[in-house]
Amino acid sequence: MTLIVNEAEQGGWAVVRVRGELDLVTAPQVRRVVHDAVAAGRHDLVLDLSGVLFCDSSGVGVLIASRRLIRSCRGRLRLILPARGAVEGSHVNRVLAALGVRRLFDVYGDVATAAREDEQPLSA
């Protein structure tokens, strides 16, 4: 399966929407988009994974690397998991939890909520 990555802006946040499978083959595409956003000075990023059906360790690696890069620029990274993912356990959420890295990320239910300054993330 291919990966589709779209970029937008909302409320001062760069929004990267990812759809498809985030794996060894497709993770470099996401890494490149995140690096390009940071290089362009966009240090507050919402990574919308609501359309991701599968994520392997390469996908998790790119999420962790993105977090590290953005934090090094004093930016913020917010994730959107598939519908009800943080509550009921989407594939992406289960992988992040199984690897013990879910707690590293601020997860929100949707892009609109993530792009608001006064919103709190969903619990880990």
Language-model region placement:
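STAS-like cytosolic regulatory interaction modules
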Residues: 1-53, 65-124
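Helical "lid/switch" subdomain of P-loop NTPase nucleotide-binding domains
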Residues: 58-59
